[in-house]
Amino acid sequence: MTTIEQTTVDEVVRGGIARGVAAIGLAGTALIHLLVLPGELSETPYIFFLFLALMVSSLALAGVLIRTGDARVWAAATVLAALVIVAYVLSRTTGLPQSTDYVGHWNDPLGMASLFVEGSVVTLGSTVLFARWVRSAAGAHAGNARASQPRGLQDPTGA
């Protein structure tokens, strides 16, 4: 196996592992919110429906991430997890409309698990997206450098 083939195999394996870990994190988000869902319908119905939407979105994104590593899917998963973190922080600081019971309640075990899982998805998604951005910027820079060289001096391998 050549170095280029090995590099391609390594990238595919790393990409598959990253997508799998992110999918597990998104499924974890859905599970954590399923566990707190029953009490929300009677207390704050809009939060109940937001949790349902979050669970469906998380599972849908997890399913899509298993099949593809498209940057738009990574961005959606990263933004969704970040929004959940923002909502959690707001619920513990200022409170949410019709829901101030959790203000100052930072040591909730499911809340901590949620922050860990969503923080992991945000970190992983941001890392994947940043690495792709760096590679595309480097590729564009290399393409511009080749285009600016006199025709006879261009690298025939395309590197």
Residue ranges and their predicted role:
Residues 2-159:
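Membrane-interface extramembranous regions
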